[in-house]
Amino acid sequence: MTAIPAEQTALADLDALPGITWRRGDRADVPAIARLYAEAEAHDRNPERMSLSDIEEYWDSPRSVPDEDLILGHDSGGALVAVGWSGCNRSITEVRRVHLGGVVDPSRRGEGIGTALLRWELAHGVAWDRAARREGHGPLQMRLSAPVHQTELRDLAERAGLEAVRYFFGMGRWLDTPVPVVPVVPVVPVVPVWSVGSARGVRLLDCDPSRSHEALAVLDEGFRDHWAYAGTTPDMWQEQLTSASFRPDWSVLAVDDATGAMVGLAMSSAYEQDWAAQGYTEGWTEQLTVLRSHRGRGVASALLQESMRRFAGSGMASAGLGVDAENPTGALRLYESLGYHRTDSLAVYRYPTDAADVVQQVDPADTMDEGDAGSTRPGAPRG
């Protein structure tokens, strides 16, 4: 296993790179960050792109601490050439999760910048966890996601000691083929309601902001058996519902006809920044879940079918979603039965250790008490 250095050591390694000056970012850097991502993602043929609003929303979120978790590298002319992101999730304690990300200008690759950035990201995640860890906190997990076709990023992750632990498929379905029709039942004039032919006793409703707390509870319960799901806080949920990409008019709720209780949902988004590169418009199903009590009754199929009708009604050419290749609920088979096909693949890499193991890898000078000669230095898009 590759050792993780102390954060001070990792910062010194960044400073040793010739021709680049490193500093923390501020809100004024957001447009430059977005431009660098756009250039690099076009070069890398990323299936999913980062938009300006994505970065703005991250920066402005009360959960984010970009002045700790982000580092920027500029060349001698002041141009931004590299971004490192060690996104520490401070909202969830069941798992102490750090999302590793970043970008290097394509013209500056091969100089060791990405290697040094990833070392800092790992070191920063360890430093944050050690400084903020409390009794009852879960293990530290540091993860990086990358399209499977980006072999250079795969090699970078593996050299840093990360291992591929899971794969996800992007899937799509053209909307020029017929979508099954669900008869309209005019039960509530303000909020249209649809009967679900194959899911007797269940109705579909428009997304209703007044039921957002109930929707969050359904999401949490429905995803409990999904890999690496550690919960969604009310703040995280609210950020999704107010995101520029979220489309409430495409989102659908499923309720039990007898009790009125929510039993499933399909939440959808529009990632317009992806459309030009992929060559078509697309409605994206962000989350699809059904409570265990109502699975096997066609509810998920009905939710997807209704989502597709809404996408098509808005002029979208395709319906898209992402799925865990090892999803335990048989989701992959369901999507294929509805005409979805695989469009791309994503790998998730994880540093294979918990917090206790990582601490043993940290430089001795960074573990001394404050009274010793050394010092401790606390630190910090889907589908």
Regions found by a protein language model. Name each.
Residues M1-D13, C88-I92, R97-A199, A347-Y351:
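Acyl-donor-binding surface of acyltransferase catalytic domains
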Residues A215, H226-A228, W250, A261-A266, ...:
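Extended hydrophobic-aromatic, low-complexity segments
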Residues T2, S145-P147, A157-P180, Q305-E306, ...:
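Active-site/acyl-donor-binding loops of N-acyltransferases
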Residues L72-H74, N89, H99-I113, T285-R295, ...:
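A short, internal acetyl-CoA/4′-phosphopantetheine-binding micro-motif in the GNAT/acyltransferase core
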Residues E41-S64, G84-T93, H226-L288:
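A conserved beta-strand-loop-helix scaffold within acyl/acetyltransferase catalytic domains
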Residues L72-D75, V255-D257:
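Core beta-strand residues in small-molecule sensory/regulatory alpha/beta domains
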Residues T2-W59, V184-V188, W194-T232, Q360-G383:
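Short amphipathic alpha-helix that is part of the acyltransferase structural core
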Residues G110-A127, Q287-V290, G296-G313, S318, ...:
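Conserved acetyl-CoA-binding loop-helix of GNAT-fold acetyltransferases
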